[in-house]
A protein has these predicted regions:
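A short helix->loop->beta-strand "cap" motif at the edges of active sites that frequently abuts
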Residues: 63-64, 131-133
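A conserved beta-strand element that flanks and buttresses the S-adenosyl-L-methionine
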Residues: 109
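Short "lid" loop at the C-terminus of a central beta-strand within the Rossmann-like core
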Residues: 141-145
Length: 200
């Protein structure tokens, strides 16, 4: 990942008061929690953690170490300081050259990250190198994501493409991509996302 890759959320979907967004996020978080429960990891590395919303949730859910990593950004570092937990560490780094040894974490996650990076295969390769058991990844499901943006009048000049989205996958296309890095144990479709739990 490079400095041209955006950090944080373009739209605060986790803090939105919009009832439709809240309903979508409730389903997203429920499916994600079920996949994490299936994986039951003792340690987690969250690649592209952004503000650390999910990273903090995971640190509260497991006793083992949880590390969030993202690009250098003072705004993110302010958020990270607010999310302090005894087993939680945030640090800066690149998804395509993770500063950890092989199989250093039981689970490695990238939630809403791969659509932003110039080389998703390089990031997934690094994630699978560092994971001893699991990858948990999610991306916007296309063309549904862009269509919903258009319906709500967002990003019309870019045909509904959210700023910073460089890559776009259908559910099948995403399964084909992540399936190269292990066995897909579960593939979920909480609208408008695709989410996969992969055994490495």
């Amino acid at each position: 990942m490079t400095a041209a890759v955006p950090t944080g959320n373009t739209y605060d979907k986790y803090g939105s008061a919009n009832p439709v967004v809240r309903r979508l996020m409730t389903r997203f978080e429920r499916d994600m929690a079920e996949l994490l429960e299936t994986a039951a990891p003792a340690s987690i590395l969250d690649v592209g953690c952004g503000e650390g919303v999910l990273t903090e949730q995971w640190a509260r859910a497991i006793e083992g170490p949880v590390v969030g990593i993202d690009l250098e950004d003072p705004k993110l570092q302010e958020e990270w300081q607010r999310r302090s937990q005894p087993n939680l560490v945030f640090r800066t780094g690149l998804g395509d050259s993770l500063p950890y040894g092989e199989a250093g974490f039981e689970a490695v996650t990238a939630m809403e990250v791969l659509e932003h990076v110039p080389d998703p295969a390089a990031v997934l390769g690094e994630m699978s190198r560092v994971a001893s058991r699991w990858l948990l990844v999610s991306v916007p499901r296309e063309p549904l994501w862009r269509a919903l943006n258009m319906v709500r009048g967002a990003y019309l000049r870019d045909l509904g493409n959210t700023p910073g989205h460089l890559n776009h996958w259908s559910k099948r296309g995403f399964a084909d991509l992540v399936g190269r890095y292990g066995e897909i144990v579960e593939l979920c479709s909480p609208p408008p996302w695709t989410m996969a739990l992969v055994r490495v």
